[in-house]
Amino acid sequence: MAVAVRTLQEQLEKAKESLKNVDENIRKLTGRDPNDVRPIQARLLALSGPGGGRGRGSLLLRRGFSDSGGGPPAKQRDLEGAVSRLGGERRTRRESRQESDPEDDDVKKPALQSSVVATSKERTRRDLIQDQNMDEKGKQRNRRIFGLLMGTLQKFKQESTVATERQKRRQEIEQKLEVQAEEERKQVENERRELFEERRAKQTELRLLEQKVELAQLQEEWNEHNAKIIKYIRTKTKPHLFYIPGRMCPATQKLIEESQRKMNALFEGRRIEFAEQINKMEARPRRQSMKEKEHQVVRNEEQKAEQEEGKVAQREEELEETGNQHNDVEIEEAGEEEEKEIAIVHSDAEKEQEEEEQKQEMEVKMEEETEVRESEKQQDSQPEEVMDVLEMVENVKHVIADQEVMETNRVESVEPSENEASKELEPEMEFEIEPDKECKTLSPGKENVSALDMEKESEEKEEKESEPQPEPVAQPQPQSQPQLQLQSQSQPVLQSQPPSQPEDLSLAVLQPTPQVTQEQGHLLPERKDFPVESVKLTEVPVEPVLTVHPESKSKTKTRSRSRGRARNKTSKSRSRSSSSSSSSSSSTSSSSGSSSSSGSSSSRSSSSSSSSTSGSSSRDSSSSTSSSSESRSRSRGRGHNRDRKHRRSVDRKRRDTSGLERSHKSSKGGSSRDTKGSKDKNSRSDRKRSISESSRSGKRSSRSERDRKSDRKDKRR
């Protein structure tokens, strides 16, 4: 350890000597010793200035500026006092009065006109010409003056050119000197910086060496102390005590050995820590030296960059002196650069176009997805609409069932009565029943097994009835009125249908056959003006719930025929009752009156007879009423056997009456009387019912008549 302390002391001495050398170099550069500390008072005096502080010095400076005339003039004080000022004012007043006196005298004195008049001298043209023409002496004088001026100007020009050349040379020399001075200054700064950095590094080394020396000395002292302690036994308890027995025994010998082992272990650990600490202290200056090296590298790079900048400046000067020799090359390079820029711009434009196309494709895809979603939503919503339609259909079916029960009672009651009041009220009841029937035509039909059975029966009836039936005969004028009334009634019924029907339904409103219209032409020319209207119900397209079967045509045929025959019975029975009360001469008038009172029944019978003969026309008109035929056939299903007997008898009687009606109108009365006998027995039981129901429907009939009249007026308009 003593050797280590000596080596450290030697290193410390060497470092001190090198530091002294650095201080001397700094003194040479700066002219002062870096170890000398400046006095604090001198700094304060230099900073504060002659005033000794901020405020005083600034005031003195301000006063100095104002006195020198650079700033605003200071206020001048009058030293003479107030008396001198007053005396001066009096003097100025006296002087102003003296000056104003002679002016007042001039104003008072009268002005006199001068007797001397200046003669006007007019120069002639010759005099002017002579003045312009110069003598030879004047010309020579002018030439000399002009020559002198030109000579002076040329001299000035020459001197100016020489001066410019000299100035250029001076400027070049000054620039070179400035560059050299800057380089020298930079070198001096770099040297100074390096010297100060060396000085700092040496100082750090000295400090480290001093610390090492101190630590080494402490370690030596501690080792000496440990060498003394190791001979004693150390207690296990703290604080540790060292003792030695007077007489040694094996137990004490063991304790000494154990304590020595422990102490040696402590000493070794302490030495290791000391060595590590010294290594750390040596590593610190190494790190500092690495930082210094990095700084030196950065400085060298800066110097190289500065030198390159100086070379570039020299090259630029050489290019300026030699001229623009490389302009062509530069122009070509500029053109190539422009072409490159244009190509870059084109590529950028193409990229932008591609991006726009991609955006458009993405938008199209998004729109398609939205459309698909909307269609799925609509498909989901369609089943809900179908369920609503089915619910409406079920409600309509319940209503139709109730109406069928009412109609069966009404159909049984609609037969002739002996009283004239019943004759007038029965057609009104039929008109009230008719809109309900038309409403049923628009409602959806029921597809059941019973409906199919009824269709088969109706087809068999058609085959039996189509063979013996003759051509229909047109009835007189009163038939046209109920047809028009039915048209007027059917239009509001069709318009008030609910939106449950999915398809467009074209409804022909009781179109008469061409034969009937031809025969009515000479009887009612006024009625031709009213056109037969067909009403269409257009609704939102929904999946069809109801389907119209071709078999419905046959159903409507049978229904219309059965209705016409039942009403022929009533009309004939009524005509016979009226003819029995009146004389044979007035039978034609009474029959016409009865037919006019029962307008609805006669019109319906004519329409039914015309539909039976004209097959295609009746099928077209009855295609719209397919759904109601099934309900009618059910309501009439109870009295099929009775209806067959009546229909056969009615057909035979029609054959007999058709020939008579063509020959003369009065023959209808006789035919109706003959047919009455067979029907009276069957119709007597039903007359009582019709009377009671007709009395109930009296109020309704009056309202229906008003509605009919209003509809007629609207159509005529």
From Swiss-Prot:
Q: Which residues carry this modification: N6-succinyllysine?
A: K238
Please give the name of this protein. Pinin
UniProt subunit comment: Found in a mRNA splicing-dependent exon junction complex (EJC). Found in a complex with SR proteins. Found in a mRNP complex with RNPS1. Component of the PSAP complex consisting of RNPS1, SAP18 and PNN. Interacts with PNISR, CTBP1, CTBP2, KRT8, KRT18, KRT19, PS1D/PNO40, PPIG, RNPS1, SFRS4 and SRRM2. Identified in the spliceosome C complex.
Q: Which positions does the record annotate as the modified residue Phosphothreonine? A: T124
Q: Where is the composition biased (Low complexity)?
A: 476-498, 576-630
Q: What does this protein do?
A: Transcriptional activator binding to the E-box 1 core sequence of the E-cadherin promoter gene; the core-binding sequence is 5'CAGGTG-3'. Capable of reversing CTBP1-mediated transcription repression. Auxiliary component of the splicing-dependent multiprotein exon junction complex (EJC) deposited at splice junction on mRNAs. The EJC is a dynamic structure consisting of core proteins and several peripheral nuclear and cytoplasmic associated factors that join the complex only transiently either during EJC assembly or during subsequent mRNA metabolism.
Q: Where does this protein have coiled-coil stretches?
A: 2-32, 163-234, 287-379, 446-467
Query: Where is there biased composition of kind Basic residues?
Result: 555-575, 634-652
